[in-house]
């Protein structure tokens, strides 16, 4: 069915003669067949959001509806891929039309010609329901792609075979309950605005290990959780997001560059293939899907990119994998919503954002979770969503930050004052929080011992005491404080500089596992306890601050992974001896 354009306003096109079209249908606009999506219908008039540049388009141009909603292709070949916001493969587009994307270019999202080795798991005669696994394809060295029955189908398998197939060839035939024979391929399509179904949602109870000490120890996120990384420009949001994408102990990472600089996506493409996953030893790119929707691409496609990314992530979650979606940045996505809302002449909300901003953000974050996947084998999968927020001027009272804070359960607030002091990650320990601490405590107690959470609480207490002591120090100076308070300031400095600070560009320090984090924090707190005992016996605080072991603790995080256990034990032993010697001398002086 086709209609005619009557108005063009930037990415918004108004067309008439589309009485039989539906909301969310994909349309092709004009002679160049630009991709668009119907936002609203009124009679036979449709407001269409066009995902490509509309210059040169005018009234009278033809609009053709496809009759299908905005969907993504799901199948083998997505891992290591780099897509734009509407799942067009950028590498294939370069091969077809060169470095500049021409308007209306059509390239299948998944390679339809490439052959994959399919190993059948199901057998003829098996009764299957949506989500059941038909077979597997070894997509990369680390990802075993499970080919599933589409979620809406059920029936009996009448034929299935292993072998070499492309994604459009029939691998099995399903006889449905109404007697129809349906051919099944390795390719599925799913509308991006609709969450993929699951059987049951569970409270998240396993932590996501990111290798970043301030995140894992102080403000942990659970697998299946939601987190926001708000911060002003230059505070290190993108580096935090890159660190999460590099080192998180998940099976698949979907990285959405939504409206950010092209250089940042280039960094990912340059670094990830060279970096090795500490758990598998393979290149990080072999578990990553990239969606690049940079700031110079059409604004409307930003709005689609987040939905595209999370739909791809849900597909891998349905296989029983732990998946992380990292969106950088949701503020740019909200700005795209604001622009389209303004063009539609809708009633603006706070700061010009549409009134439905909070509900759209919630739709994104609520698709995260730890779930029992559909299918008869009770697979468990998780989808963790992390979104960066870029509030203008670092003002966390603006609408996107406030709406995000109401939805997410982990808030890593980046602070420009810490970034200017070269303290990275610049996560402010006084304004950040994690609401998963209680639900993760049983896991920490079982795997790391109850002292891990106790040490975390002690360290947070020391940092809070430091903040209140700093006000006094500014008035009367450090020397006016008692020895105990001076020790609190010194230990807080050790926690900040020797534990929380982490160098993302230093191979040894970029990733730190839980056991190492526990030992390092335990060593700093042990220094605190031993020094307090020594001060009580009359030892000089200044002498205690200058022991050789104090400097060794400062260098402990740069010890190679294979040596750290022995080195940390040696530092602990040296520290105990050196403090005991000063304590004995302090007692003798009295």
Where are the model-predicted features located?
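N-terminal accessory targeting/assembly segments
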Residues: 1-102
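Short alpha-helix capping/helix-loop boundary micro-motifs
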Residues: 11-16, 46-52, 112-123, 156-160, ...
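Short, surface-exposed secondary-structure boundary micro-motifs
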Residues: 18, 32, 68-69, 87, ...
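Metallocofactor- and cofactor-centric catalytic cores in central/energy metabolism, strongly enriched
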Residues: 36, 44-46, 68, 153-157, ...
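Short, compositionally biased
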Residues: 40-46, 76-87, 143-163, 182-196
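P-loop NTPase nucleotide-binding/switch module
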Residues: 95-150, 166-226, 240-243, 278-297, ...
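C-terminal amphipathic alpha-helical interaction region
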Residues: 535-590
């Amino acid at each position: 069915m086709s209609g005619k354009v009557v108005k063009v306003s930037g990415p918004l096109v108004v067309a008439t003669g589309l009485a039989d079209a539906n909301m969310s249908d994909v349309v092709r606009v004009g002679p160049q067949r630009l991709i668009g999506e119907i936002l609203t219908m009124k009679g036979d008039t449709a407001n269409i959001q066009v995902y490509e540049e509309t210059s040169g388009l005018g009234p009278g141009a033809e609009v053709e509806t496809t009759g299908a909603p905005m969907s993504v292709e799901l199948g083998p070949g997505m891992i290591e891929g780099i897509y734009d916001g509407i799942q067009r493969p950028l590498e294939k587009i370069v091969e077809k039309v060169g470095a500049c994307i021409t308007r209306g270019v059509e390239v299948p999202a998944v390679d339809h010609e490439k052959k994959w080795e399919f190993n059948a798991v199901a057998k003829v005669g098996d009764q299957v329901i949506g989500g059941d696994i038909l077979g597997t394809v070894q997509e990369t060295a680390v990802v075993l792609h499970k080919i599933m029955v589409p979620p809406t189908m059920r029936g009996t398998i009448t034929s299935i075979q292993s072998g070499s197939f492309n994604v459009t060839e029939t691998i099995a035939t399903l006889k449905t309950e109404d007697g129809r024979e349906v051919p099944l391929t390795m390719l599925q399509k799913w509308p991006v605005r609709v969450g993929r179904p699951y059987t049951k949602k569970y409270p998240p109870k396993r932590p996501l290990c990111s290798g970043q000490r301030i995140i894992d120890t102080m403000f942990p996120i659970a697998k299946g959780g939601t987190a926001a990384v708000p911060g002003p420009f230059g505070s290190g949001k993108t580096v935090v997001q890159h660190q999460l994408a590099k080192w998180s102990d998940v099976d698949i990472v979907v990285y959405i560059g939504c409206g950010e600089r092209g250089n940042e996506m280039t960094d990912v493409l340059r670094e990830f293939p060279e970096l090795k996953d500490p758990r598998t030893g393979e290149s990080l790119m072999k578990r990553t899907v990239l969606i690049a929707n940079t700031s110079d691409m059409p604004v409307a496609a930003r709005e689609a990119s987040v939905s595209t990314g999370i739909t791809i992530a849900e597909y891998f979650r349905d296989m029983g994998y732990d998946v992380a979606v990292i969106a950088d940045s949701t503020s740019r996505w909200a700005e795209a919503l604001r622009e389209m809302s303004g063009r539609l002449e809708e009633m603006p909300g706070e700061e010009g954002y549409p009134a439905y901003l909070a509900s759209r953000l919630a739709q994104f974050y609520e698709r995260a979770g730890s779930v029992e996947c559909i299918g008869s084998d009770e697979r468990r999968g998780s989808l963790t969503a992390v979104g960066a927020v870029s509030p203008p001027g670092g003002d966390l009272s603006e609408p996107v930050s406030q709406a995000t804070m109401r939805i997410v359960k982990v808030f890593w607030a980046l602070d420009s004052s810490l970034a200017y002091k070269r303290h990275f990650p610049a996560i402010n320990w006084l304004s950040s929080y994690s609401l998963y601490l209680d639900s993760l405590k049983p896991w920490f107690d079982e795997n790391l011992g109850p002292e891990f959470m106790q040490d975390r609480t002690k360290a947070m207490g020391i940092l809070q005491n430091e903040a209140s002591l700093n006000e006094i120090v500014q008035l009367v100076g450090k020397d006016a404080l008692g020895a105990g308070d001076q020790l609190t300031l010194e230990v807080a400095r050790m926690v900040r500089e020797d534990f929380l600070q982490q160098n993302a560009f230093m191979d040894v320090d970029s990733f730190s596992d839980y056991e190492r984090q526990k030992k390092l924090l335990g060593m700093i707190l042990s220094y605190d306890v031993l020094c307090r005992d020594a001060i009580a016996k009359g030892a000089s605080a200044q002498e205690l601050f200058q022991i050789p072991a104090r400097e060794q603790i400062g260098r402990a995080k740069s010890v190679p992974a294979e040596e750290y256990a022995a080195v940390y034990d040696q530092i602990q032993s040296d520290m105990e001896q050196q403090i005991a010697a000063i304590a004995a001398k302090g007692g003798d002086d009295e």
